[in-house]
């Protein structure tokens, strides 16, 4: 399995650690980080500046989103700023990758319909991260819709 991470802030690193814990070294992890910062954010939200992300997480940094997508990831974890979620998800789906998009899906509704249509057209899974999916209020809302 090959996973591409777009954005390695605290939530991106949390998802990366979770994936490593679940799948171990069987996952080839690529990552693109636009700012190129070398900061590790620990589980208790401590920041280690100057840390080597590649050796810490056993990943390979790619220079651009396009370079990462050209490696045919099975899944792309989209953890960059919200305003970039939809364009990155569309690019990943277009490259044949399933997508996990961190919440919120976007900062506006532009192209959300296109994103849903592209996932359906390509037969790929598009998943939006949500920690409240089993909350009683959310369940009630789902039933009423």
Please provide the spans of the model-predicted regions.
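Short, well-ordered alpha-helices that flank and scaffold nucleotide-derived cofactor binding pockets
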Residues: 13, 17-21, 90, 94, ...
């Amino acid at each position: 399995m090959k996973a591409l991470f777009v954005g390695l802030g605290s939530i991106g690193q949390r998802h990366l650690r979770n994936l490593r814990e679940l799948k171990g070294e069987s996952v080839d992890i690529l990552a693109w980080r636009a700012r190129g910062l070398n900061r590790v954010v620990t589980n208790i939200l401590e920041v280690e500046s100057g840390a080597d992300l590649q050796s810490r997480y056993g990943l390979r940094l790619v220079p651009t989103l396009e370079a990462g997508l050209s490696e045919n990831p099975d899944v792309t974890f989209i953890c960059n700023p919200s305003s970039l979620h939809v364009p990155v998800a569309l690019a990943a789906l277009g490259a044949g990758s399933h997508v996990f998009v961190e919440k919120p899906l976007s900062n506006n509704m532009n192209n959300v319909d296109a994103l849903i249509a592209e996932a359906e057209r390509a037969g790929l899974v598009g998943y939006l991260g949500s920690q409240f999916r089993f909350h009683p209020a959310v369940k009630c809302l789902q039933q009423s819709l």
